[in-house]
Amino acid sequence: MIQQQTLLKVADNSGAKEIMCIRVLGGSKRKWGNIGDIIVASVKSATPGGVVKKGEVVKAVIVRSARGLRRTDGSYIKFDENAAVIIKEDKQPRGTRIFGPVARELRDKDFTKILSLAPEVL
């Protein structure tokens, strides 16, 4: 579960390395986000010459969560880290590459471009 102040790794080549969650979108009292949810985040560290800079406020979609997710068939999927992909306003990724595996649940939430760029879909 991702909440305010959670640090996430960035799983794309947009230039950011680490972001911190400011808000989970989807209601005024929403406290936690999981895989496929959109968050507003601040860039905490970035590579020089990247698209995004340190201190910039961005929107991102959660692609990996250490908490895990229960699927409809009763199985669970859990990752070693919390990771997100920085997106534009039209839900397209700002980077051109995705690093690491992503969950299949992103297809239900219309993030097909992220799924097509990912090296592995679990």
Swiss-Prot record:
Gene3D superfamilies: Ribosomal protein L14. One of its GO terms (biological process) is translation. This is Large ribosomal subunit protein uL14. Binds to 23S rRNA. Forms part of two intersubunit bridges in the 70S ribosome. SMART domains: Ribosomal_L14. One of its GO terms (cellular component) is cytosolic large ribosomal subunit. InterPro entries: Ribosomal_uL14, Ribosomal_uL14_bac-type, Ribosomal_uL14_CS, Ribosomal_uL14_sf. GO terms for molecular function: large ribosomal subunit rRNA binding; structural constituent of ribosome. Part of the 50S ribosomal subunit. Forms a cluster with proteins L3 and L19. In the 70S ribosome, L14 and L19 interact and together make contacts with the 16S rRNA in bridges B5 and B8. The lineage of its organism: Bacteria, Bacillati, Bacillota, Clostridia, Eubacteriales. Belongs to the universal ribosomal protein uL14 family. Keywords: Ribonucleoprotein, Ribosomal protein, RNA-binding, rRNA-binding. NCBIfam families: rplN_bact.
